Amino acid sequence: MSTPTYMDYSATTPVDERVAQKMMQYLTTDGNFGNPASNSHYYGWKADEAVKKARHQVADLVGADSKEIVWTSGATESDNLAIKGIAHFYHKKGNHIITLKTEHKAVLDTCRQLERENYEATYLDPMPNGLLDLNVLKKAIREDTILVSIMHVNNEIGVIQDIEAIGNLCRENKIFFHVDAAQSAGKVTIDLSKLPVDLMSFSAHKIYGPKGMGALYVRRKPRVRIEAQMHGGGHERGMRSGTLATHQIVGMGEAFAIAQAEMKEENSKIRQLRDRLLAGFVNMEEVVINGDMKNRIPGNLNISFNYVEGESLMMAVNDIAVSSGSACTSSSLEPSYVLRALGLSDELAHSSIRFTIGRYTTEAQVDKAINLVRTKVDKLRDLSPLWDMFKDGIDISKVEWTAH
């Protein structure tokens, strides 16, 4: 069996060869395996140097000060640390949090946990294009609101939120603003020296770095305080205890440095491939593009193929590695909660495919995906009585089904 073509770059990315080479220098006796906290000898000093360099590399990509970067095990931990950290530290100021229904589960489930601790959370509806209406956010703000958490780029539909406008609204109301940037770092320009953002979560494995590695930006001016969620040796200025994984950190730093050097050129190439993919589907009947196409990262295309059953479609196109939702929730047979929040029917949400292309995608792979999906969708529709009814001009939404 040949290996399927990988088109699921929003789920994870392969580690860049250059990143892997750097990481290997910090694992064995051939390189430097020291503990960065061992400040009494050469091995610790060299490891600490590597960690400091990586901290600068991550900070440089996003316009931050290196002292504002806190290492974590990934964006999920960063989201937890930011949201719980603010809620617990500033609980006397208020207990209300605002987020969006289309956020990643790492944000939604963290807010739900805080609700069990007697905090209150408001989950806003997005507009049908996936973007947040600022007026909806304005109306949700209360005197006891302490935090707004809105992701920069959605992991399923790839839309880019206007975090500058959202942040300005938060500043006007003296509310902390957290942004999950796992899907935007290296794809969208981020300058935290100018953006009104207090906390921002990052992931290494979404940007051709290693899994199990992330960071949280915590603003210093004006100073943002968070309560630690993990206790121990007081690492990361007391915000996140635990021995630093030097090789992972070096990998994340290198991945961010490569992204900074190559982002403009890479985005141009990926956008051309995405547009080629889109052009292959636009003339098909009953195809719906999910999410705003203007405010969107280059590599994402989320399409619903009406009158095709979701699981059948995913099985039919198993020669390409794609997803029908977030990788974190795709084991569920429920339709995507993100697409349902946009107002899509269960049927359309079920029949969606998320194509995400990246650094190693080729034109030949895009053409293969177009041909495969078109062929399989046509075949599945030929087997569908609903498709026959649609072709006969019957409005299926008005059909009254009876049980036997």
From Swiss-Prot:
Keywords from the UniProt entry: 2Fe-2S, Cytoplasm, Iron, Iron-sulfur, Metal-binding, Pyridoxal phosphate, Transferase
Cross-referenced PROSITE patterns? AA_TRANSFER_CLASS_5
Alphabetically, the GO molecular function entries are: 2 iron, 2 sulfur cluster binding; cysteine desulfurase activity; metal ion binding; pyridoxal phosphate binding
BP term (GO), one: [2Fe-2S] cluster assembly
- Annotated [2Fe-2S] cluster binding sites: C328
The compartments listed are:
Cytoplasm
What is the name listed in the Swiss-Prot or TrEMBL entry for this protein?
Answer: Cysteine desulfurase IscS
Which organism is this protein's natural source?
A: Ruthia magnifica subsp. Calyptogena magnifica
Encoding gene per record: iscS
